[in-house]
Amino acid sequence: MNDIYTDIIGEGYPLVLVHGYFGSSNMWCNQKKTFSKHFKVITPSLPGYGESFKTKSLDNIKDMAKTIIKITKENNISKFHLMGHSMGGMIVQEIVKISPKIVDKLILFGTGSIGDIPGRFEPIDVSRERLKKDGVKSTANRIAKTWFVDGDKAKNFYLCEEAYQNVNQETGDCGLVAMKNWRGIENLKDINQETLIIWGNLDKAYNYEQVKTLNENIKNSRLEIINGCSHNAHLENIEEFNNLVLNFLGK
């Protein structure tokens, strides 16, 4: 656990942000700047990813969730707002399942409740095969291009390149296995937190059915759609994304 990088910035009520597959703490850089004016913002890099690339990766969502819970305990954070993106959205759903009382408001961004991700631009098994055949950097680059409307020409694509620079083959495969084997749809009815669901309408990883399922099954939830954005809406329309989150959190 000691090699897990966690950035903590700002003061006030804690807000924990959990990145997705091939992500890092720094993928939230455009959120940290804004949110830290109102909150204590905690952004870990998951084991094997980003700044935690030296830490052994995990191959299941539950262990990733337990890792985030442990980080909050180590930093004496007993209750917090929680946001997860993509695979991070699976992790935060699992955190709510394990320890519902520690989570205040919940934000599910570009994510779903079925780990195999029906409607994804390619099945997870295909990504695993391509990872084996093409290697980690080539696969990460190919996948990350789908996260932006403008592909690798997007202004903030470089953040993805930085994030996957040191990720190894094992971590790449572990993440895909973790997602494929996870399922949270049956637990949605038990989520009592006030929940904001954010989705870019051009997302190629998660289609509308996935976020609609979240919205219909989480009783106290609302869905906000950011038009003209893909999977990484927080890096494409930063202002609209940040405003949605701050308004939801009452700032």
Identify the residue ranges that each predicted region occupies.
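Conserved HGGG/HGGXW glycine-rich cap/lid loop of the alpha/beta-hydrolase fold
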Residues: I4-K54
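Active-site loop/oxyanion-hole signature of alpha/beta-hydrolase fold enzymes
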Residues: K33, I42-M83, N243
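Gly/Ala-rich beta-loop-alpha elbow adjacent to hydrolase catalytic centers
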Residues: G84, G88, V92
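Flexible "cap/lid" loop of the alpha/beta hydrolase fold
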Residues: Q93-I98, V103-K133, S138
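Conserved alpha/beta-hydrolase catalytic His-Asp/Glu region
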Residues: D116-E122, K133-K189
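Short beta-strand/loop motif that positions the catalytic acidic residue
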Residues: I191, I197-W199, D203
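Catalytic histidine neighborhood in serine/cysteine hydrolases
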Residues: Y208, K212-N232
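Catalytic histidine-centered segment of alpha/beta-hydrolase-like enzymes
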Residues: C229-I238, N242
